[in-house]
Amino acid sequence: MTGGSSSRRRRAEERSSAAGTERNSRREAVGGMGAGPALAALLLAGSVLSATLLAPGRRAEPDLDEKRNVELKMDQALLLIHNELLGTSLTVYWKSDDCYQCTFQPLANVSHGGKPAKPSVAPVSVSTQHGSILQVNSTSEERAACRLEYKFGEFGNYSLLVQHASSGANKIACDIIVNENPVDSNLPVSIAFLVGLALIVAVSLLRLLLSLDDVNNWISKTIASRETDRLINSELGSPSRADPLSADYQPETRRSSANRLRCVDTFRGLALVLMVFVNYGGGKYWYFKHSSWNGLTVADLVFPWFVFIMGTSIFLSMTSILQRGCSKLKLLGKIVWRSFLLICIGVIIVNPNYCLGPLSWDKVRIPGVLQRLGVTYFVVAVLEFFFWKPVPDSCTLESSCFSLRDITSSWPQWLTILTLESIWLALTFFLPVPGCPTGYLGPGGIGDLGKYPHCTGGAAGYIDRLLLGDNHLYQHPSSTVLYHTEVAYDPEGVLGTINSIVMAFLGVQAGKILVYYKDQTKAILTRFAAWCCILGLISIVLTKVSANEGFIPINKNLWSISYVTTLSCFAFFILLILYPVVDVKGLWTGTPFFYPGMNSILVYVGHEVLENYFPFQWKLADEQSHKEHLIQNIVATALWVLIAYVLYKKKLFWKI
């Protein structure tokens, strides 16, 4: 009995030890992958619940609004204009302080008050997205009585009092008072961001904790002890049962791609997740929409980052393919075919017309995001293809931080890129545009005091209208609402493609740094930091650290060179952070952004095609609530992260 018990205990311990080894191996094999669905689900549930339970919704409109017959919409406040001037009618004009050199637009006409105690009151809705500039004119004399600037809050209730100043009968005073405080519409965003950040940090810390040997040993001993006792006391622990976990069993581990840089996929996924979120509406917040003209918003960051990291991937993949001995002719054919597919898919996506009847060829939009990517990919990939040189072994062993081998080896490419940029500058600033000043970079419409209403985009807009025609361009540019532009303008137009090529080539440069100085962390980080500083200084000079007053303002619609240098500066800075954290130290696996980054084409095309379908969109109880839109957009974005994770686990990738 004693011998049988000892034999049974020894067999049980061996089985427990093998099981523990399998668990550890599985944990090492999965690594950061296993946290993917849990983190995505937590991000989804935590962000939605926190935004739902803690953030204020839309404030109910007060009785005063109903009596005045003013229905407030999102990003609006109620303004009651009190005219206390006897015998003087008023005209109130308005403009946004974000509208550069815009003409005032009429807001309301207020008749004169009939009695001293009963002023005439006119209710109007005013925008709360940016600060407002109000000008009160005497209707009869058409002279400015007063002018004031004010930042209204969403769903707030305000009064503008126009009365005689106490200092003199001929002087007019204008004051704004708050009747009812606005809601804090930015609170849902703050809560969702903090919850998401906290969950990412928590999961990363948990992974770091589980990677410690002491913690792993404690878990293994605990599991082994319980498993041993269970097997001893169980009648199923028979020695005659076939034991798959014998001493000769070696657990299978997943082979990871040692050559694949995880930070690149993480960066691509970060840009893609932000792109999905802002394309779905971004909670209808103005800073998640594209800027009206000059300046930057969150939505303006994502596309150029995607272009940048595409350039990085071009060099990494081309180097890998050619080093494996792939035929150059076959590689060139792949470049041409992929570019063609990107352009075709892009044209299909931007011209859905699913419910509007047959597609009219007269109004097909030709430019678009994937079209821009296709052309950019073709030019940059062909450029690298014809001038590609093998990376010498001595280069990867070189330790000097002052080496410029990654730049000097690419002088033909740099010469080509500088030539392209010279063409952009020449066309932008010297091409004569009928009816417009040469070198005009403005939005047209009511901008520039309304002098050039049909000059939107200057040379860029003119070239697109000349080559493609008005009907084949984007009909609702971001400048329409604020600047009241009247002509079609496409932000993915012909001239801007030159600078997207420049941006992709800067991404190629990042890829060369990663390859030329492989395993030399200090050399890589030094070069990332240097590029970040150089591009940042160029941006400072071009913009004069001003949204509108620089030599070349930052402008997403134009894809100005300052826009490219600024966003490339940001991109190098992000790689400066991601590379050591993700690939060198392994402190973060890139979850959850890594998974969409591995299936970027599928996620982008899928989110565009299925945008209006459940579960990505549903009817909201209150269409004028930022909170409800934010919840919907977070859910939709998180679902695409989950889809990308599932496809990653099933090894399903859409490659073109």
UniProtKB/Swiss-Prot annotation:
| E.C. number(s) listed in UniProt | 2.3.1.78
Name a biological process GO annotation: heparan sulfate proteoglycan catabolic process
Q: Cite the record's tissue specificity text.
A: Expressed in the retina.
Cystine residue pairs = C146-C455
Q: What is its main location?
A: membrane
Q: Where are the Cytoplasmic topological domains?
A: 207-268, 317-338, 389-413, 515-522, 579-585, 649-656
**Lysosomal targeting region: annotated segments:** 641-656
The entry's localization annotation reads: Lysosome membrane
Segments on the Lumenal, vesicle side according to the record's topology features: 1-185, 290-295, 360-367, 435-493, 544-557, 607-627
Residues modified as Phosphoserine? S238, S240
Q: Sugar-bearing residues?
A: N137, N157
Pfam families in the record = HGSNAT_cat
What positions constitute the catalytic site?
A: H290
User: Mind listing the UniProt keywords for this protein, alphabetically?
Assistant: Acyltransferase, Disulfide bond, Glycoprotein, Lysosome, Membrane, Phosphoprotein, Transferase, Transmembrane, Transmembrane helix
* Cellular component terms (Gene Ontology): lysosomal lumen; lysosomal membrane
Where are the bilayer-spanning segments?
186-206, 269-289, 296-316, 339-359, 368-388, 414-434, 494-514, 523-543, 558-578, 586-606, 628-648
- Residues with PTM Phosphotyrosine: Y249
A Gene Ontology molecular function term for this protein is: heparan-alpha-glucosaminide N-acetyltransferase activity
Using the UniProt record, name the top-level EC class of this enzyme in a single word. Answer: transferase
UniProt's post-translational modification comment states: Undergoes intralysosomal proteolytic cleavage; occurs within the end of the first and/or the beginning of the second luminal domain and is essential for the activation of the enzyme. Glycosylated.
For region Disordered, the annotated ranges are 1-31, 234-253
Concerning PANTHER family, the annotation shows: HEPARAN-ALPHA-GLUCOSAMINIDE N-ACETYLTRANSFERASE (PTHR31061:SF37), LD22376P (PTHR31061)
Function description: Lysosomal acetyltransferase that acetylates the non-reducing terminal alpha-glucosamine residue of intralysosomal heparin or heparan sulfate, converting it into a substrate for luminal alpha-N-acetyl glucosaminidase.
**SUBUNIT field:** Homooligomer. Homooligomerization is necessary for enzyme activity.
Record-given protein name = Heparan-alpha-glucosaminide N-acetyltransferase
Q: Which gene encodes it?
A: Hgsnat
